Amino acid sequence: MSQADADITPFFADDNEGEGPVENGVGSPLPEDEEEESPSGVTDRRAIMTVIVLCYINLLNYMDRFTVAGVLPDIEHFFGIGDGTSGLLQTVFICSYMFLAPLFGYLGDRYNRKLIMCVGIFFWSVVTLASSFIGKDHFWALLLTRGLVGVGEASYSTIAPTIIADLFVKEKRTNMLSIFYFAIPVGSGMGYIVGSKVDTVAKDWHWALRVTPGLGLLAVFLLMLVVQEPKRGAIEAHPEHTLHRTSWLADMKALCRNPSFILSTFGFTAVAFVTGSLALWAPAFLFRAGVFTGVKQPCFKAPCDDSDSLIFGAITVVTGILGVASGVQASKLLRTRTPRADPLVCAAGLLLAAPFLYLSIMFAQASTVATYVFIFLGETFLSMNWAIVADILLYVVIPTRRSTAEAFQIVLSHLLGDAISPYLIGVVSDSIKESNSYMWEFRSLQMSLLLCSFVAVAGGAFFLATAVFIEKDRDLAENYVPSDDAPIVVPRSGRSTKVSVSSVLI
């Protein structure tokens, strides 16, 4: 049995063992009335249901991540902390998420992805619930639990896109990825809205962290009931080719020599830097602008004014949907004219977002309406990247390396992006601030947020560079021909040793 036909495996089984119906009369035949399976081993109807479940979990993922941002003023007031310290809440989460991604990427390329996600999401739900019972003298415990939440999210984010890639190809894959990535802005916006409203109703920010755990347990149930593990690469593999696993080191060497993957990852890092900064600090910045101009009252007692979180959350939802949809459609139209369409659309999105983000920050004091209009435009252009970047990764990397590539991209984009940006913005704000007056609280955060516009321009440059290599790298991935894995003799430690071809090839 080929490896492509043997991917529905027990959790700790090797991929050389499979289960389910097989060809040539071996195994149990499918019932005659059952829908015909695709090469992935999953029926079309089950594939659609799988994408729906994965979208639900992705939405829940981002909803949980940004619930904290929706109640950040209350958390700062409750623990008596400043900008630099509160910025750590996002940083510790992203750091654990980032460092665990390679582990789950390695496991996702070799073991049953469905069960890995089930275990990770269950753990994430339990830890999130535990974080909602922390008292005011134990801020370190909140940091610890927010860090542990990254375990569950790393188990999901590195694996889910590769499952979609094994269910669909070409334009249908792009469409499904766009649906999947709609959940990012929608979930983020819902995090702001649900977090702030639950805080207002319950008059305690802790309750905002108790919404997603129950929904997470429902996600585990849906994963077990609905999702079926597809066969890796079977839907797009050439019939005469069998894809072999190579070592993790060989995978990493191959990825590092893939310029389209590396450059698009750096471009996506810029997106992560900007979105991470805005996600945590935009509502707080808008609130401080209102206090400075006298439109809002300062927060002396929780719950604080949540109108900015609600409006920013609604903007995030709408701009995310518009941005992802417009990015995908622009890419489809441009593909008829140039095979470099995807990185060019990503570059345009970042380069157009930069001036509008700059204007939104500078107009915060003068006009609230103008500020929201510029935020709307900036976030719309910024959101054009999500589905397209994922599609680029999937078509320039071969199937047996995709989870590892997802993990590598997560590590780099978070290490230099949203792991550092919230903390960096907070530290710069604290260093600029000359006093604790309302004016300096606003001005210092305003100046530090201007970094986002310049990072967006740098990201656009990386995507323009990606366009130079995209044709060649896509062709190499689509026409990848693995060698026969029969043993060959190589010199090792002064003697001849038989090893498999895949262990020495990159």
Curated annotation (Swiss-Prot):
Reactions the enzyme catalyzes: a 1-acyl-sn-glycero-3-phosphocholine(out) + H(+)(out) = a 1-acyl-sn-glycero-3-phosphocholine(in) + H(+)(in); a 1-acyl-sn-glycero-3-phosphoethanolamine(out) + H(+)(out) = a 1-acyl-sn-glycero-3-phosphoethanolamine(in) + H(+)(in); a 1-O-(1Z-alkenyl)-sn-glycero-3-phosphocholine(out) + H(+)(out) = a 1-O-(1Z-alkenyl)-sn-glycero-3-phosphocholine(in) + H(+)(in); a 1-O-(1Z-alkenyl)-sn-glycero-3-phosphoethanolamine(out) + H(+)(out) = a 1-O-(1Z-alkenyl)-sn-glycero-3-phosphoethanolamine(in) + H(+)(in)
Organs and tissues of expression: Expressed in yolk cells.
PROSITE patterns xrefs: MFS
Keyword Transport carried by entry: yes
GO molecular function: transmembrane transporter activity
Protein name, as recorded: Protein spinster homolog 1
GO cellular component: lysosomal membrane; membrane
Deletion consequences: Presence in early embryos of an opaque substance in the posterior yolk cell extension at approximately 1 day after fertilization. This material progressively accumulates and by 48 hours after fertilization fills the entire yolk. By day 3 of embryogenesis, embryos are severely reduced in size compared with their wild-type siblings and they die a few hours later.
Span list, region Disordered: 1-42
CDD domains noted in UniProt: MFS_spinster_like
Transmembrane regions: 52-71, 87-107, 115-135, 149-169, 176-196, 207-227, 266-286, 310-330, 344-364, 373-393, 408-428, 450-470
Pfam families listed in its UniProt record: MFS_1 (PF07690)
Keyword Hydrolase: no
UniProt keyword terms in alphabetical order: Lipid transport, Lysosome, Membrane, Transmembrane, Transmembrane helix, Transport
Composition bias type Low complexity, residue spans: 21-30
Functional note: Mediates the rate-limiting, proton-dependent, lysosomal efflux of lysophospholipids. Selective for zwitterionic headgroups such as lysophosphatidylcholine (LPC) and lysophosphatidylethanolamine (LPE). Essential player in lysosomal homeostasis. Critical for embryogenesis. Involved in the regulation of developmental senescence.
Subcellular location: Lysosome membrane
Main location: membrane
